[in-house]
Each structure stands twice: as structure tokens, then as C-alpha cells.
Amino acid sequence: MGGPEGRFHFAIDRGGTFTDVFAQCPGGHVRVLKLLSEDPANYVDAPTEGIRRILEQEGGVLLPRDRPLDTSRIASIRMGTTVATNALLERQGERVALLVTRGFRDLLHVGTQARADLFDLAVPMPETLYEEVLEVDERVVLYRGEPGAGTPVKGCTGDLLEVQQPVDLGGLRGKLEGLLSRGIRSLAVVLMHSYTWAQHEQQVGALARELGFTHVSLSSEAMPMVRIVPRGHTACADAYLTPTIQRYVQGFRRGFQGQLKDVQVLFMRSDGGLAPMDSFSGSRAVLSGPAGGVVGYSATTYRVEGGQPVIGFDMGGTSTDVSRYAGEFEHVFEASTAGVTLQAPQLDINTVAAGGGSRLFFRSGLFVVGPESAGAHPGPACYRKGGPVTVTDANLVLGRLLPASFPCIFGPGEDQPLSPEASRKALEAVATEVNSFLTNGPCPASPLSLEEVAMGFVRVANEAMCRPIRALTQARGHDPSAHVLACFGGAGGQHACAIARALGMDTVHIHRHSGLLSALGLALADVVHEAQEPCSLPYAPETFAQLDQRLGRLEEQCVEALRAQGFPRSQISTESFLHLRYQGTDCALMVSAHQHPASARSPRAGDFGAAFVERYMREFGFIIPERPVVVDDVRVRGTGSSSLRLEDVPKAHSGPPRVDKMTQCYFEGGYQETPVYLLGELGCGHKLQGPCLIIDSNSTILVEPGCQAEVTETGDIRISVGAETASVVGTQLDPIHLSIFSHRFMSIAEQMGRILQRTAISTNIKERLDFSCALFGPDGGLVSNAPHIPVHLGAMQETVQFQIQQLGADLHPGDVLLSNHPSAGGSHLPDLTVITPVFWPGQTRPVFYVASRGHHADIGGITPGSMPPHSTSLQQEGAVFLSFKLVHGGVFQEEAVTEALRAPGKIPGCSGTRNLHDNLSDLRAQVAANQKGIQLVGELIGQYGLDVVQAYMGHIQANAELAVRDMLRAFGTARQARGLPLEVSAEDHMDDGSPIRLRVQINMSQGSAVFDFSGSGPEVFGNLNAPRAITLSALIYCLRCLVGRDIPLNQGCLAPVRVVIPKGSILDPSPDAAVVGGNVLTSQRVVDVILGAFGACAASQGCMNNVTLGNAHMGYYETVAGGAGAGPGWHGRSGVHSHMTNTRITDPEILESRYPVILRRFELRLGSGGRGRFRGGDGIIRELLFREEALLSVLTERRAFQPYGLMGGEPGARGLNLLIRKDGRTVNLGGKTSVPVYPGDVFCLHTPGGGGYGDPEDPAPLPGSPLQPLAFPERGSVYEYRRAQEAV
């Protein structure tokens, strides 16, 4: 932040609530200022007002607000702003039209086809950023040299392409003129394969600008990376947000003389670099505000702490941002914000819905914090505006916040202090619920004081914030205890010591400007210019010269751009990156070679191969040396170094620190006399023993008992965190510890999953994340499970309990079991479950179990992939394991398991496993994941004791049971109030006519129910048979949906339920029955029947639409979305997966680049949703044109029986599978078949619609469809990982 001497340098963080101003004044001293971001009664623009006030204070001359400010004394202004974020959240951007290749009209509506919330029956409609769609007549495909193909063109990646249809500019002109006449001035242009061949997009863009469109965002310019869906979302976001940002910038400039012509004005981008205001664009601005904080602690805490890795902890009002810095910024290149996926470099900032304004609830015996927030208005109860009780209120009740340290800006007139009385009153209402449960609940206990309740909520909030930090560190091979916790933001100081203790950290660093660290980060940030282009080259010696040439060209672009901004070459540095992956995988890593100098076997820019292997090994625990490495993208990041040096270091104070006052703070042992210090009066070397409070105008720091704070030579606060005092926890139920154990148990399952994903080698487990990890009690009952893959929810406990019954005393330390048999709780054979019994000193039987279930891509059988559409016996579907000791006496039984995996080859027409190497590697990874779970539970037992941990395993199951009993009673009460019986029933049919019948009898006094499937059809000669475990999984899924809120998903969900399934039926077939279709099809019908009996919603598409394509050198499998059923108060979502699956679909550009197909159409099947007062969602039309001979297999349902409507709603349309031969002949394939296809043939899949709800003729006004929530409670790589896990 350099510039002429004697002038001001401003760094401004314009947040959603407050604007922070950091100014380096002439002479080097610093002024800081905090003001409201919105105060229209007093000023138009907060950053301008902040600058005016500081100029006025420093100059001693009144500067009227209604006159532009003189810029002669201003050298630079740097700003981070939430303008783009707020426009995205509030959907207040520009009116936009999307121009997309014909056949892909609804591509961005469908997106990945996965739903965001697995258990929300009212699947929210995606609120797309565009207002209209124009389909562009053009088509470019990858060149394969087929007969009749035209002359190929070469893309910038090096790929050859074929222009099958030039862009029809004449036909497009009239359509664009129509858009202009309707007032639309901003366009997003998204054409297939434009990442490598952009000419069509450029032609469309030129025409649009010629016609007068004011902003045109080309996807090939917004982010030239393969995958049209995220690239299209990015282009739309750019078109939607950039005009808004430009208007804000222009308005800001008008507040200054000469419109800032002679002032360097820079804006913070999402990647942590500054950009000139004229090139500040919407898709790069969404994390502009939070990015400043990361830069701030990277430039301060990391340096001061001697290069020790740092976890950034920024706790605000509605959420907490968590990030990591260990010498270089950690970027992600795709993340979702406010329901929009952006493909652009962004700092990996993980946001969790736990902030000062997070609301507090007591639900079914569990303390719950968030994700709902009080927001800025009305705010927490203590704001005196009738708001709900929040984390801030809990801290105020505990004495950890002092009302006197806050300005009097609260209440309706915004002139009153914080109100502890309002906090106590609001919390007392929750405490009454808590104590009613404690005295009248299943385990009567002594009531809690108001302070104990407040303390409980604070502890639960702390544990919620620890989970993403563990995921951000341990999941990537880092030890959280080896980090420093850098705390900033208004609310973080009250929680920092507790967070650090829980994670084993011994140091908390709080910068003296922690309340304005994002503004400070802007002052310290570098100016960045990036250049990137896609690539399609192998990383091999023969391509190194090309890679050097490309990197050199991009480096020149970056250097020239920074020189144009006034940086001399001596202040410019560049860093080169390659986006690398192993061939045949999707897991690409953006790697820099700055720590790996060039060698004889590398490009001149550095040894990227060594960097890739090193990082791959660190993140995943293995490498794949036999596979070639591929370059997806080349990137150069140019940096113009900031020259700011802070000179406002506080002077040392002589004498002991002065206590400003004494107050009473509540801790675990009760109230303690707590001294209060003013930060401004503390000097270098002052040491403060906890407990104490350190106050300044922007934050409150709580130093807990057993901790010691010291003022460093730079004026910061470094807290040495003492070991946590061992708390005595009994086996009796304590709701506070129940909530904490709930988080700990879930964290164990999540970390098991991270180890499995890191160490597995197959695409299914490593990239598609098709696995579950779980923790079980001593009786085999499920305690916690992550992720929540619906078809695994109830099945894994059946598997564990079968092994307990089967082996009993024949389980010994060092044993690990393998099972997949349907009779032993298996779902289908490719899902292999690895179970480890855990022994403890002094115990003769296992004290708990851990297990991991992963979908293996092939375990033999009659077809590749082990999912044949026409199997009639279990043996045809692959290798079978009933109760197999995978590890015996600590030794992995490789020879025996290899023999078992090859055994299907002895059956006529079958093959053994076709990928033994991946099977063995993934089984070892599952064993390693289980071992991690054992270690983590061992740590828990070491902290609390075996009896306490086992007791809380039981308590957490009882909590889930209570939530289900409450739901069943509420359902029964509602029926009684309407004079209806307590018995409900439903019936539906599979396409072969097999009935699925259900009768549910509610017992009101017990809050229980009998689910009786008697009358369901017999076992079928085919593969639609569903093992008993499938029905239990479907039932747990439905119960969770009916409860309608977050509850622990475990064995307790089924405790209030007795399930009757007739032996020998389609829902409990004989041990040798084929079952692969039961897992993917019958499970959906079971869900439809259960939800139909409860009247919860109409039937969804009831199918996963399984499509397989393969030949001697290629295999592809996908499931395709359809319509969701409507319900009481919502329309069904169109083009989405429902219920027992949530699989993401392959991006069209990836599909066409890796497989011999052209995707001709992928759009909604308009009108296929059932009519009703609330309409069912529409299905999908998907057309694949084949470019090679192959075998096409379809395994589908709802081709004969329509998805039902409810309450007078009409059914959704049946699905349809058509094959259009090259000669024009059309064949209906039916629901289940395998058929050879040839070049020129087209498969046309029409997926079913969802049923309607309510009378279509009902004249009542239709409410709007549920939309994506306008807040983004969670964001970042941890959130994306969990979302991906739940999308399988």
C-alpha cells in the first residue's frame, strides 16, 4: 500500500452490518473507525463517510457531506465489499438472459440433479439468476474422425473439434432484439465446448454488443475450464453481479472530486488478491469481504508465530468463517454460495451456521444451536427488539459480555444499551423446557440453573465450530493441535480459549486490530493478476516444451498487466501452476512447483510432477505410479507486492496492568470474580492470568481459567491455553453432554470417512464418495453414521447385529469382518461392509463396533459393474461374503479374499472380479478407516471413561427414539382431531404387477407404530427383490423426513416401530434371490408407499433410471433425475433426484470427452408432472447419440404404473425408454433390457414426472414454490465435501 509520502492510504472492509476503516495517515500513524454500513438518515455511502470523517479528524477542517471530497491528500483506497454477496443473497442483481446451445435449455436449472437437503420433501426450486433463456442453433463436438465428418478445428487445449452446426446469427438477431424490447441488457453466453473453442461464443457476444447490450459475459472468458454446468453458473453470476458492482463503483467515485482519477483504487477479490476497480467482476467478488481477514492473519499471526500453521477463526453475527494458512493461500476452484456454484479461484473459507446471532433451541432432549439466525433485525433478545434467544444472549447471561462496553444503539429508537434482562427472560423460556424434560422425561434428573443452561448452549456452539476445523486439518493429514488459532471478528474472542482447548491447541493469537482484521488485511494485501487457460496434454517430457511456452505466455500477460498498474518489475513476482490428475480419475490438484526447482526431467518452470506426487501422497496416503498424469489447466498468478509497513506499535507500559473493574463471570465451577482490562491501556510484556476480560471498542476477549494472556511486543494478545480441567461426567443423562456427545460421535464417523476417501483408490469411493462409515454400540445398534446415504441408513446395523449373532464368542482382538450378503444386512453385492469389533482392557466382549460400507465398481458376475438388468439369482451378481474374516489375528487375509473375489468365474456365464487391485486397495482403506474410528473412540473413552461413553451411546439412541415418538403422537393427534382412525394404509405396484402393501397402526399412549407389509407380492424371478435391510433403510429415511428437522440418525429411530415383513416376499426374499434392482428401484416404491400412507406428499418419479453403456474398452453408468411429488403447500421440484438416491450426473462436456456419445438433449419434460393444486415436478428428456458400437442396458421403473397423486392430485407421467435407429425406426425398449447399439443410433430417455397434490380445479391461489434459502449458512471445501457425499 505504497504511494507518495504525506498522503493517506485507506483500507476499508464494507461488511453487511458494519464498515471498518483502517487508515495510514501522513507520518505513519494509524486511525481506525467502525460505522454502520447502512445509515441512510446520515450518509449515502459508508466507505465515503469513513474517509470523510478521518480526513476531517486529521485536518481539523469541517468537510460537508453533500460535497465531493478533495482527493489531493489521498494516495490509495483499497476495499473489500459484500455488495456482490448481498446482491446474490437477496437476488437483487441485473436482469439477465441466458444464451445456451440448443437442447440444453434447462441445463442450469437441473445442474447436478442432486438435491441440497437430503430429507426435505419440499425440495426447493433452484432460483436461477437468469430471467429468460434463448437456445442458440449451433453445435461443436469433439472430433473422432467418423465417416462424413467435416474438417476439424483445433481448440486451445490442443483437442480437435468438429463444427457440426455453425452459429445461426441471422436467426439469433431477432431473438436478441426481442430481449432488448423487454428491457434485458445483460447476457450470459454458455455454449458447449467453448472452454477450448470459443469462436461461437465470441460471434454471439459481438452481435449482442452491436445490438446494444450493455454487459455480455462469455463463459469462455469468465472461466475457461471444462464442465459447462459450473462454467455456465459462473457466467450467469458474472452477468448478474458485474453491472451491480459497476453501479456501486460509479456511485462511490461520484463522492470524490475528479471521480478518483488520480487515486489508486483497488478491490479485494475472492482469491485474496487486489484488482483495479475497472476490472472488478461479479464472479470474482463473492468472497471479497471474508478474504481480507485471511490475508490479515496470514500477514500478521503467521509471521509473528514463526511460521507455525494458523487456523483462522472469524466469528460474526450469523456465521463463523474457518480457514487455514501454512505459508501459502489454500484455494478452491469451485464452491457454492447462495445456491450458485462458481468456478473461479477462491480462498478456502469454510462457513458454518454458528455465530453470535445463532438461535438456541431445546428439541426432544437435545441442546441445538442454529442454523437459524436472529439476523441484524430484530437481532438477539438483548437488542431490545423482541428478537429470539441466541448465543450472544447466553454469553451475556454468563457475564462474558459487558453492556457498558457497547454503545447505546439498541431498542426501537436505537438509543439504549444492551439488555441483560431481555436475555435472561428469553433464556428462561428455554430453561423451562429443559427442566420440564429433566423432571418429567424418561430419566428424571435435577433441574438446571439459568447459567447452567446458558453454559450448555455455549459448549454446544463451541463443539459445532470445532467440527469443520477438524475436517479442515485432520482430513488433509494435518494435526489441529500443531496450529495457532488466530481469532478475529466481533464474537470470536469469547469462544477462542474453549475452541483451542477442545482441539488441543496451546496458543491463541488475537491481533490488536482483530475487530478490523479484514480491513487490515486489505492494507497488507498484494495486487494480483491471474491468467489461466485450459489444457489437454499429458505431463510427460515430450510436452514440457509446450507447457513452458504456455506458462511463459501467461507470465508475460500477468507482468504486463501489473506494470500497467504502476508496479516496477522489481516488485512483481509470478507463480506458475498446473492442474494435474491421474489419467482415468477426476481428482485434479492445482499444484505449484515453487518448492520443487526444475530438473532435467521437468519443465523449466519447475518440477510439477514431484509437487503433484508429494501433495497427492499427503492428502490421500498413496500414489498411482503406473498411471500417466494429465494436465487439465495451466495458470499463472502474478503479484505486485504491497509496501505498507505498520508503524502504530503501542509503546511499552511501565508497572503492572491496571484493572478497570471487577465483574462476575460464570464458568464450569460457578461464578468467579473476574478482572476487566482495557486493551488500550495494556503494554508490551503485561501478563494477565485467567479468568479475565479484555475489552476494546470492537471486541471482548475472554481469557478462561487456567489460561494466561500476554501482550506481545507488537501489541497483540497471545493466550497460552492451559489443559482443560477434567470434568466429572456421570452415566446419567445430561442434555448438555448429550448434545456434545452427539457432535463427537458424528465427528468420529466423518473423520473415518475422510480417511477412507483419502486412502481408497477407486473412482466410486475416492471421487463419487459412495460409502458410509458408522459407529455402533456394544449390541450392534447404530450410534452415528456419516454421510447420510439413504440406502445405508438402516442396513449397516443389520449387518453388524448379524455378525454378533453369527460369531458370538468367536470374535477376537485383531479380527476384521467382511460381509455383503443380503441375508446378513447387505443391500446389494457391490456394497462391501468391513466391520471391526473393538475390545477394551478388562472386557471379554467387544465394547463397540466400527464399520465402513463402500460401493466397489466390480465384484464379478454376468456383467461388468456387477449391476446386471436381467439377473435371476444372487450368484450372477458377483462375489458373496456372508461372514468372512478379512483380517484374522491382525493379518490381512489377501490370499483368501482374492480367491473369494475370483470365485464367481467358476459359475457358467459369469466372471470373477474384473478389478482385483482396486478391490484389495479399497478393502485395506476400509480397514484403515475403521482403525481411525477405534483410535478416536479410544480418545473419547480416555477422556470420559468406558461406562460414560457407552451410556451416551444409549442416550443418543434414546434421543432419536424420543423424536420419532413425538412425531407419531403428533400425527395421531392430528388425525383424531379430524375424526379419522389411527390406522393408515397405502398400496402401490411394481411394473411387473407385484404389489407393495403397507398398513400402519399408531399407538398414541406409547408413541409407537406397527408397520405391516403383509400382502406384498412374493419374491420375483428377476432382480427387483429387496432385502429386509433395504426396507428398514427406507423406513428410517421416511421417519426422518416426517420428523422434519435434524435428529441423530441411529438405531433409536426404529425403536418405536415394529416392522412386519412376510418371509419369502419381494421385501424379504430367499437367500439366493437376485437383488440388484431391489436396491435401486424397489426401495423407491417402498418410500412412496410409506409417505403415501402418511399423506406426506404425492409419489415422486419412483425410479433411479439406471443407464449402463459399455464395450470392450469402455464402461459408463448413470442415474437420471425425474419429477418430485408435490405436497401440502409446495409444487414438486422438476429434474431432481428424490428419496433413496441423490447421485450427481456427469457434466455434458466430460461425458462427451470421455465416452463415444453426443448428448443431443438434456432438458425438462414439460407437462409430465401431475396436475393439482400443487403441481408435480416434471421429468427429464435425455437423448444420447452413439458414436461407437456398444451394449446399452436400462434398469428402470414407473414405465407401467404412474406416480400417484394425492388429495385429488393427478398422477405424473410414466417414463419411456425409446431407441431410435439410424434408419429412423423407433423401438420402445420397455423398462428393463440390454440391447446392442450402433453409430448413429439415439437413446431417448423420458423420465417420470411427480404426482400432483390437491384438486387441480381448486380456485385457491397457488403459493410460490419453495426457493433456495437466501442465506448461505455453510460454504467452503468442508461443506462441498459433505454435499458431495450425500449426492450418491
UniProtKB/Swiss-Prot annotation:
The Phosphothreonine modification is found at 151
Residues carrying Phosphoserine: 1265
Q: Where is this region: Disordered?
A: 1249-1269
Location in the cell reads: Cytoplasm, Cytosol
Q: Does the keyword Nucleotide-binding apply?
A: yes
The organs and tissues expressing this protein are described as: Expressed in coronary artery and kidney.
Q: Report one GO cellular component.
A: cytosol
Q: A biological process (GO) annotation for this entry?
A: glutathione metabolic process
This molecule's function is given as: Catalyzes the cleavage of 5-oxo-L-proline to form L-glutamate coupled to the hydrolysis of ATP to ADP and inorganic phosphate.
Q: What is this protein called?
A: 5-oxoprolinase
Q: Which organism is it from?
A: Bos taurus (Bovine)
